[in-house]
Structures are given as C-alpha cells and as structure tokens.
Amino acid sequence: DLTVKKGDILLTKENADTTIGDQGYTLEIGDSITIKSTTYQGIFFGTRSVLQALVASGDALTINKGEARDYAKYEYRKFMLDVARKYMPMWYLKDFVKYASWYKFTDIQVHLNDTSYNGHSRFRLESDIPGLTATDGYYTKGEYRDFQYYAEDYGIRIVSEFDTPAHSAVFIDNNSELGFDGTHLDIRLNSDKKETVYKFIADLYEEYMGGENPVFVT
C-alpha cells in the first residue's frame, strides 16, 4: 500500500475529477500535496502550479493549505518558432520547451522551411533529397524525433510544419520544375506541373511520416 507522508507530493489519476477536461487537475494541500488528473498532461500542469507557488513564496518555500480546481479556458495555447528564417540550435529549442511549459502552453509549431529576409531559402531538417537540407544549421532526423518526445514529457506537442504552396523557394531552388515563379509551387489548375508537385510533396511527407520509425511522432 502507498503511504503518503508529511511533505510528500502524490501524483495520481485515481479518483480524478472527470468534469474538468484532459488538462484539468485538482490540488489538495495539507501536510502533503496531492495532484489529481485524468491525464499525464493535467498532472504535469498541476506540478507547474505547485512550483510557481513555491517560487512566489520566496525564501520561505511554503504553500498555504487548501484545495484548488484548475482547468483550461482555452484548449490550445500555442505559438510558432520560425527556425527556417532564423536557425535555433537544439539546446535552445529544448530550453524554450521548458520555458513554455512553465506557462502551461500546449503546442509549439516549428516552421521548418521558408525564404529568409536576406533572400536565402532554408529547409532545416536532414533530408534524403540531395541538396535540400540547409548548410548553415539543421536538425538530424534522430535529434528532431527525440526533441518531440522531450517536449511531450513537458506536456507540449510539437507541430511540425512545411510551408506550401507559397513560401516554397527552397523546394523550387532544389528543383525548378516545381514552381511557376521563385516562391510558389505550380499547382494551378491548367498547369502540366501540378501532378509532379503533388508527388514531390507527398514523397516529402512520406519521408518524415512513413515507415516503422517516423520522424514526426506528435
């Protein structure tokens, strides 16, 4: 049997409130602290509240006794990191995940391709397509896969984004047959290129989402 002692923090799904959604949680604070939720994410958000209360108490490192019932007003709380225009090393992305989790964000959209303000196009993932991957900073498939699992541990989902059919200069620079100008893929109704474009994009997604060990996992 589990015995909760003075000063313990118990994280549990047992007898959790099912009326406050997947992100909701309850706090019971006495000589010990109990955080209940129906999901891992809800429990994790509860731990952030406990940490925030401890930080707010200053050197005292104490929390007032009582009960709390917390749930999300907005289900999705997200923002975008434009790593295409401005490369951010993996250590920075992981630090940002921890920062975002403190404020109980749920999603981080990672913008993986675009045309930079200096006119240079970038694709920030390791790719099987020769010449597509940026040379001034990119993420290997393995480290990007691990990054998504890392974020998941902090209650955050990584939403990976390829920007098409506009903002697609990096694909056109790699294969000029894909575009009708410098930045737009040619999917016009009367274009004889559109089937080639569709296949290119489908193959690109298959590279990262297909197989037994996909790169995009969340």
Predicted regions and their residues:
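Substrate-binding cleft of carbohydrate-active enzyme catalytic domains
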Residues: 75-218
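Contiguous, structured surface segment used for ligand recognition
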Residues: 1-73
